Amino acid sequence: MKVGLYTVSFSGVWYDGPALPLTEVFALAKDMGYDGVEIGAKRPHANPMDLDMRARQTMREQVAARGLEVPAVAGYSNFASPILEQRENELLVAKEQVKLARDLGAPMLRVFAAWRGITLHNGHGCYDMTRRYWASGFSDVTLLEQWRWAVECLRELADFAGEHGITLALQNHEPVIRDHVDMLDMVREVNSPALQACLDCPLLAQQDDAWVVQSVRDTGKQQVHSHYGGEFEEEGGKAVQRPIRFAKRGLINYPAFVQALAQEGYQGYLCYEFCHPCLGENHELLGLDEVKRQVSLAQRYMRQLLDAAARPVKLPAKEKEKAAR
């Protein structure tokens, strides 16, 4: 397995400070020991409409010059709107992101079935408002209708991606997708070799060993990409996970997740993303230096888990049935 850095971490949204140019992000990724960079296909970094072919070739050369790879381009698709024109617009953007992935030499595009988006409040990112907007925006639309719209769009997009040699990696990210079972069901219903799974541990419905391991087993060879997040500290010369401030969840069970991935034979990327408000002890918004510290610790933390995974431990016994909701 390899460890990547997702460029959204330095997009200027989640901390008090400016976005870093991609050239600086590439340099940081190399200096901090990452193997590759996942490039977010939106401003300020890589919106396809801002990049002509020359700019794309330059970006590809800059990554290669650092000895890095581009394992994926990250899209932000929402195929669950009841408004036909909005779904068509989302397809148009996603198809341009497919072409961007091709031009950057990335093998895949990360996609969502649906996405609430973010807003900038006083210049900084938050999820609060879009969660409320999503809940109240289409009160007469059913989840099943949204599911069918997403499947329809993903089928069209998968056909397009396949023609360009790109694999779509469907993330187990809400809304519409509620858990890894939904993700796998949608991949099965789309029924295209160009649509596979991006299973992320923080998004699993439960974090106990048995659930995490079974989720990885359920996904199996359909797993082509993954992300990890969180915050870290240094203790006793090692990077250790700590709870995210102001978040209503505990630690993520990355140890069981990585062990299970290793035993399933996964050889792809785990890409770190810092995509939540960077807060200090008094809930003040911290700056770029703290994000850099977290990015460095995150790489060390995942390397520790990969080293441990090279010495397999006994995982929970396989279940006869797939994990159920």
Give the positions of each predicted feature.
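Short, small-residue-enriched loops and turns at beta-alpha junctions
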Residues: 45-47, 77-81, 116-118, 174-177, ...
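Short glycine-centered, acidic/aromatic-flanked micro-motifs in structured strand/loop junctions
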Residues: 41, 170-173, 201
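Histidine-acidic metal/acid-base catalytic patches
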Residues: 1-35, 64, 105, 155, ...
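Active-site acidic/histidine proton-transfer and metal-coordination neighborhood
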Residues: 23-27, 61-69, 81-196, 316
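Conserved beta-strand positions in the central sheet of alpha/beta enzyme cores
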Residues: 38, 72-74, 110, 169, ...
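Short coil/turn segments at secondary-structure boundaries
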Residues: 47-51, 78-92, 248
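Glycine-rich, proline-tolerant flexible connector loops at the mouths of alpha/beta enzymes
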Residues: 38-60, 114-120
